[in-house]
């Protein structure tokens, strides 16, 4: 892992690496690399190995590479390592030399700094020889499950007794772009089956409360998987493992390493199976397509789970429901003056703060706000179409945008341009209200630099309400009515005009309140001027 100068260090790293002894650091040393038995010349550039082939590989041809490398497992600091804070002996991620991705833009060779990655799908056959007392969870299916036992052949079976000092574990995984595993002699194993998927929960049991919390992870996974399959597209792999290990939470194909049994992290890391493991966007260049889409899915899954458990949202929860935290994070970043465009590569933000908010919060809001623009139901159809068209194909932002435009029938280039490529903000306000010839006239003003369509709610003194909708001319159309609620559609608001006047057939005296964007899905940086309450 490379370490450079940053104005705000990751608190989990800081200067800890520099304090490791020679026996505690991690390294990988390439001993040899052969192609079809012929040694190949290599050069090492930091964390990148360049191979100048002695013979070109023709299109459609097949070759076999054999690599011998030596590695030392570091004391766990980030992602991979031994003896983490929770006492897990080995958290084995980023443990082998991994192929760089080659796509339609060429080779992707960023230095690895323990953040995002972009990988090549392939089939893995991994054999691990380890002390017989260790228990392992990881990517893939255990091929020799009968010889191992420990719940892998049948739930509840113990680890098989063997006479040798080491035990052999053989995992196989198809169509994945990475492989992770963790090992500890004190691991416990919970197994559930749901809709053809084996759900493994592997953890260290400290006490009965800890065991109950991990049992809750298994129950929650069992509850939400059918919803995830229906909402985001069917999970295509035979198993998924929630494994205690690493630090925080980190996603891998068919598995995640978790610090603890918190369900928010559980749902987030599992959602990465869709928005990274199956779709495989370049999260180094477009982390919002990975972390942001995943955070949106996490919010939706968490809301579903809570509804199944009988929880109801508090009246004090800020709108939009399920995603309010993302909006708070984004608004704080805007106020800080540290905002950067979402086109910034993940490793090249000026601050970790801006990276985190852009990748997670603003990326999440990209989808909640897309629901505001095209309707939530159309947005959900877009996400399923995106899954169907682009899984296992490495989509770029333009590919997602094309799907969104095709499904919605609306022009959305402007949305990506403003929200992704700039730091311009949204701010609409109620300018003035008056009566003329028995009709009321409302003037709205665009104060921010980013244009949007407008949802408007009128409340009258008799407690009745009206929903009004002002399309944005840039979309060349409008969204359908939402939730079957009738509405009044007005002429388009031309994006070049800072003000808009709306006429409605009610006397001013009958009006009680006017509210812009009552669902709060629009990321208006100053909602204080969105509501006008009339005191008669």
Give the ranges of each region predicted by the language model.
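Hydrophobic helix-coil surface modules that form long, contiguous segments used
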Residues: 97-106, 113-267, 296
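A surface-exposed beta-strand-loop module
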Residues: 12-87, 163, 493-509, 519-520
């Amino acid at each position: 892992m490379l370490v450079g100068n940053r104005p705000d260090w990751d608190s989990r790293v800081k200067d800890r690496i520099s304090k490791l002894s020679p026996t505690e650091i991690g390294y990988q040393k390439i001993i040899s690399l052969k192609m079809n038995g012929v040694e190949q010349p290599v050069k090492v550039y930091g964390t990148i190995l360049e191979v100048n082939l002695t013979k070109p590989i023709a299109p459609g041809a097949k070759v076999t590479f054999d690599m011998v490398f030596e590695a030392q497992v570091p004391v766990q600091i980030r992602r991979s390592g031994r003896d983490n804070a929770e006492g897990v002996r080995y958290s084995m991620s980023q443990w082998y030399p991994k192929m760089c991705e080659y796509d339609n833009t060429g080779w992707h060779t960023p230095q690895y700094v323990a953040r995002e990655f972009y990988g090549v799908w392939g089939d893995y056959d991994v054999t691990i020889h380890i002390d017989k007392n260790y228990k392992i969870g990881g990517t893939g299916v255990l091929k020799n499950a009968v010889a191992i036992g420990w719940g892998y052949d049948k739930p509840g079976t113990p680890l098989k007794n063997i006479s040798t000092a080491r035990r052999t574990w053989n995992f196989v995984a198809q169509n994945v772009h990475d492989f992770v595993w963790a090992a500890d002699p004190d691991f416990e194993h919970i197994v559930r089956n749901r809709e053809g998927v084996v759900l493994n929960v592997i953890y260290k049991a400290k006490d009965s409360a800890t065991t109950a919390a991990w049992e809750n992870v298994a129950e929650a996974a069992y509850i939400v998987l059918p919803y995830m399959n229906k909402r985001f597209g069917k999970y295509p792999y035979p198993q998924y493992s929630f494994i205690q290990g690493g630090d925080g939470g980190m996603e891998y194909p068919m598995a995640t390493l978790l610090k603890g049994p918190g369900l928010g992290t559980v749902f987030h890391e599992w959602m990465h199976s869709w928005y990274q493991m199956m779709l495989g966007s370049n999260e180094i260049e477009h982390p919002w397509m990975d972390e942001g889409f995943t955070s949106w899915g996490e919010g939706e899954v968490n809301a579903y789970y809570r509804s199944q458990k009988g929880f109801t949202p508090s009246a004090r929860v800020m709108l939009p429901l399920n995603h309010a935290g993302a909006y708070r994070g984004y608004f704080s970043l805007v106020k800080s003056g540290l905002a950067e465009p979402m086109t910034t590569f993940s490793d090249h933000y000026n601050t970790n703060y801006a990276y985190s908010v852009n990748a997670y919060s603003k990326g999440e809001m990209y989808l909640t706000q897309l629901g505001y623009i095209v309707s939530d139901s159309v947005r959900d159809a877009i996400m399923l179409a995106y899954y169907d068209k682009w899984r296992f194909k490495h989509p770029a932002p333009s590919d997602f945008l094309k799907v969104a435009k095709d499904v919605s029938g609306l022009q959305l280039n402007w949305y990506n341009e403003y929200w992704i490529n700039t730091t311009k903000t949204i701010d609409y306000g109620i300018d003035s209200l008056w009566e003329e010839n028995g009709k009321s006239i409302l003037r709205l003003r665009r104060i921010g630099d980013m244009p949007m369509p407008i949802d408007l709610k009128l409340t009258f003194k008799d407690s009745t309400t009206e929903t009004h909708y002002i399309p944005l001319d840039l979309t060349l159309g409008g969204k359908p009515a939402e939730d079957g609620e009738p509405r009044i559609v007005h002429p388009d608001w031309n994006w070049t005009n800072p003000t808009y006047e709306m006429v409605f057939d009610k006397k001013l005296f009958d009006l009680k309140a006017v509210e812009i964007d009552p669902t709060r899905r629009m990321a208006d940086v100053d909602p204080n001027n969105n509501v006008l309450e009339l005191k008669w």
